[in-house]
Amino acid sequence: LLKSIDLITPNANEVQKLTGNTDVYQGAKDLSNHTNIILKGGHRTDKMGVDTLFYQGIELDFLPLNTKVYPKHGSGCMLSSAIASNIALGNSIEISCEKSKRFIEKQLLSNHSLLAYYV
């Protein structure tokens, strides 16, 4: 099934559940043998806030521009939707992930509540 998917966007907890591996990085790397993956950084203990793209045998870290963010409900869904939208606009997976990371960071900084404001 994974071979027919272009990109999956799990967080650290989801990688552990999908692979049974407590080493999130290794679990994501193992998944990348079957499909492209962006490991979201919000729940990571090894690289908090860093999203890592495993794509065609390479790894790209998207570092957060801000260390102070406010958690939001649905931020993972916003990220995957933003990536899909950027791909639909003709951007590569790498560019789509980077643009989407920056978009989501704006939402995470938008206010102190769990609801995002689009800025």
Label each region the model flagged.
Residues L1-E59:
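Conserved phosphate/ATP/ADP-binding segment of small-molecule kinases
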Residues E14, G41-R44, L65-K68, S100-I104:
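Glycine-rich beta-alpha junction loops
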Residues T19, I87-A88, L108:
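Hydrophobic residues in alpha-helical segments
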Residues S32, C77-S81, E98:
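Internal alpha/beta core interface subdomains
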Residues I58-N66:
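A short, charged helix-loop
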Residues E59-L60, N86-S100:
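Phosphate-handling active-site elements
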Residues V69-I93:
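Short, small-residue alpha-helix embedded
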Residues E94-V119:
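Charged C-terminal helix
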